[in-house]
Amino acid sequence: MTTRVTGNERRGRQLLLRFSGFLSAALTVMALITATRALAPVVAYIAPQRVRSHFMRRAFASGNCRSRRFSVLRSTVGTETRNENNITTPYHSPLPTSRYVYQSSRTLSSRNPALPLESTLMHSNANELTDVELKNLVAHWRDHPVLNPMVTFRSWVVPIKGKMIQAILNSKSLQPYLASRHELLQEMHVRLKIVRDYTDSTDGTEKLILLHPDTPPLSELPADVQQLLRNCQIHENGPVMPTKFTYKDFTASYILSQLLPIAVHPPPTAFETIGHVAHLNLKERHWPYRFLIGQVLLETLPLIESVINKVGEVSGPYRTYDFGLLAGRNDTRVKLTESGVQLQFDLADVYWCSRLSEERQRLLRTFQPGQIIADPFCGVGALCLLAASLPQRNCTIWANDWNPKAVEYLRENARRNHVSDRIERLQCGDAYDFLMDMGLQQHQKASTRSRKEDVTNKDGNHVTPTEPMRLPDHVVMNYPVEAPKFLGALRWWPVPPSSRRGSTTRDGGIGSVIVPRVHVYTFARADPTTDRDAEEVAVDLVAANLLPLGNTIHCRTEMNEDYDCDIQVHPVRDVAPGKVVLCGDFR
């Protein structure tokens, strides 16, 4: 017999099933929340920054943060950082923004109502700060108490006798007690004067030496130190010396380490100085604080008037890059001096790298007075002007660049440094054509000389004029991205019949030529698949582009044996992990 289910019973069963599903989902969510709170410390160590920030906030809010590191962070919020003498001391914990910055921001908020009471510096993820919070932080960081501390130094009264004061300062036993050992002073770019005049001295024969705030009175010092002080005729403690410091006394790296959240540590400290411009390449985690970083650098570096940050990669036919202004005036027309040579150009128009200064000096040491230097990638002409301007070099310059503005800056800088007569050739065009044309011109000169009549020398013998073909003495190809590809243009240059090395001029009758020394720059990485280091990779790259027929081993063997052309590799700089710029020199 079949039981008939009524409509009400059917609807009741459906409601019961739905309620069971909702109850199961709620229990699952509660279990996930409990697991999230319990696993917060573990996730905080291993998760990416965005996930880590979420779990840390949940842990702080719930109180279930069991990790020792984060428990210390919670317990230190709002605590005082003063010693027994009520002397404010800097906080040097691995968590530099945990308690000191928090309590300081509360004091700062009372004076600046626009600043939120909860310190914006406590946020682990800067991307979650509002625009108002970031603007307030940039506006009020100079008033932060952590950057304007008052330190009260103790002192000793020292008699002025001979070299007594210098002996105390140099004593290894007494140096730990001097004010110069204070941790805060290690973060300053100004030197504190620890020897002061003693105004209470009756006869003016005594001075004060400032001591570390934690230095105990004379009677509490170790016996050997007391005896040493008696030998130096130090018998009494001097007055305490309250000293006020401001943010202007500290280095930019210290200021940023105190202001930036832990999540974006370490703070950016490396930048390139180009005239009045500080050029940064900020990481993604520093991007939300870019204006704060720019203001700090502008305030702490006296010669800097503009702070810019590179946006994107170096690209385009002229190897330029976009940048954004972080602080200061919007002016990228810079003036700088290198080894007495004045350079002026606009960073927005040309490529410039101050880190190549040492490499330019190395090249200059290889130049001889009166030589001809060819630079197919001259840029604004720093190397060209140095070679032409320095009295001990006085070289003749053949220069070329693809960027018309770079060529114009070189022409103006040559006129500014009074070496325009040394710039014999200056053109704007393709570097391959520039190199190839020099070789073709020498072939034409050789053909012209071969048609001339023989002349008689002083011995009465008929000879053909053998004036060397005038190729440059040095060719500098500083364009690491593609310079080796232009080596094929050298195949248009005359090759001397003799391959013996040891002289820049190789004789061979009509074909006598001056053999240039080529300096070609390239990027290189080690190749573990072929067991070659970066230098071997660079040598093979140069050989393969100079003699493209055959494999690289064949090319290298042909250059070494047939042409007696040994490539010497010099490291220039690191540009990325495992990636370097190398300079290959050969004749």
UniProtKB/Swiss-Prot annotation:
Residues 446-469 are annotated as: Disordered. InterPro entries: MeTrfase_TRM5/TYW2, SAM-dependent_MTases_sf, TRM5-TYW2-like_MTfase, TRM5/TYW2-like_N, tRNA_Gua_MeTrfase_euk. GO terms for cellular component: mitochondrial matrix; nucleus. GO terms for biological process: tRNA N1-guanine methylation. Its main location: mitochondrion. Belongs to the class I-like SAM-binding methyltransferase superfamily. TRM5/TYW2 family. S-adenosyl-L-methionine binds at residues 360, 430-431, 478. It catalyses: guanosine(37) in tRNA + S-adenosyl-L-methionine = N(1)-methylguanosine(37) in tRNA + S-adenosyl-L-homocysteine + H(+). This is tRNA (guanine(37)-N(1))-methyltransferase 2. GO terms for molecular function: tRNA (guanine(37)-N1)-methyltransferase activity. CDD domains: AdoMet_MTases (cd02440). Keywords: Cytoplasm, Methyltransferase, Mitochondrion, Nucleus, S-adenosyl-L-methionine, Transferase, tRNA processing. The keyword Methyltransferase applies. The keyword Ribonucleoprotein does not apply. Its EC number is 2.1.1.228. Monomer. Specifically methylates the N1 position of guanosine-37 in various cytoplasmic and mitochondrial tRNAs. Methylation is not dependent on the nature of the nucleoside 5' of the target nucleoside. This is the first step in the biosynthesis of wybutosine (yW), a modified base adjacent to the anticodon of tRNAs and required for accurate decoding. The lineage of its organism: Eukaryota, Sar, Stramenopiles, Ochrophyta, Bacillariophyta. It comes from Phaeodactylum tricornutum (strain CCAP 1055/1). PANTHER family: TRNA (GUANINE(37)-N1)-METHYLTRANSFERASE 2, TRNA METHYLTRANSFERASE. Residues 450-461 have a biased composition (Basic and acidic residues). It is found in: Mitochondrion matrix; Nucleus; Cytoplasm.
